[in-house]
Every structure is written in structure tokens, then in C-alpha cells.
Amino acid sequence: MDEMNLGPEAQELHDSIVAEIQSGVLKLKDGLPFGTGDETEMQYDVTLRELTAGDMIDAQAAAEKLVMSKEGPVLVSSPSRMGLEMLRRQIASVGCIKGPLSMALIRKLSVDDFQRLSLATEMYDMAVAASLTQERGRVAAVPE
């Protein structure tokens, strides 16, 4: 992604997200409200985590919906719902809010924060995949 020709604003966003991922905490611009009434506090610091096989299975199950067709009941999977389910499970915490976030909390994010979080998780996944690729195929030297 570093090699793409991005406009100045996109490059700045990319660079800030990369730096924040490397530091371990992503900052939301607008924040996520926690609490009710006068006790509501905005939460800004997002900690991400790697998805597990269990997370993937749970996200897939949550993305499926039973619909009736001419031939009878059919399970249909929604790719957009799958993406949201994976996103919410990848969030370890937002401030004092422990993950995975509920869909109700995801809906409370501003558009800017939602897009920032989506980009960050995508970049985080790419970084994890790249590190796995670098490790792959390396064999420790064994004395003979």
C-alpha cells in the first residue's frame, strides 16, 4: 500500500493509521459514547487484535440468514454483514469498552471513525499476513 500514488490527504491518513497500528492504539476522531445522560464519556483509544478461527466461524454464522425459496429454506450469507461481524470481533477495546463491540455500538460511530476503523483493520490484517509470509518457508539450520 505504501507504493500507491495517494493524494496528500489520503497519504496523511494512511501514514497516521500505520503509525497508530505500530504503536498498538488507534485513535478515533469523534469517539464512541459510553454511558448515559450526564455520565456519558467519549472513548477514543481502539486496541485491535488478530482474529481467531473461532471468530471467523462466529462471524460467518452471524452473517447467515435463513430465507425461503421455491425449493424450500436456504441459508444465504451476506458479505457485508460478514465484514461487519469480523470488524466488531477484531476490536479488543475502545477505551473502557471491551470488545467485541455490539452492532448497536458500531452504529454509534461517526462515518469518519467507521471508515478509519475499517481501513485500520484492513491494514492490520495486511501487516499480519505480510509477517506470516516472511516467516513462511524459513527453516532453521540444523547441524549435521
Swiss-Prot record:
Entry keyword annotation includes tRNA processing: no
Q: Which family does it belong to?
A: Belongs to the mulikevirus tail assembly protein family.
Q: Which UniProt keywords apply?
A: Host cytoplasm, Late protein, Viral release from host cell, Viral tail assembly
Protein name per the record: Probable tail assembly protein gp41
A cellular component term (GO) from this record? host cell cytoplasm
Reading the lineage from the top rank, the first entry is Viruses
State the organism named in the record: Escherichia phage Mu
Induction cue: Expressed in the late phase of the viral replicative cycle. Expression of late genes is activated by the viral late transcription activator C.
UniProt feature coiled coil, ranges: none
Entry's Pfam families? Gp41_Mu (PF23746)
InterPro entries, sorted: Tail_Gp41-like
**Could you tell me where this protein is found in the cell?**
Host cytoplasm
Purpose of the protein = Required for tail assembly. Together with FS-gp41, may act as a chaperone mediating the interaction between the tape measure protein (TMP) and the tail tube protein (TTP) thereby directing the polymerization of TTP to form a tail of the correct length (Potential).
Return one Gene Ontology term, BP aspect: viral tail assembly
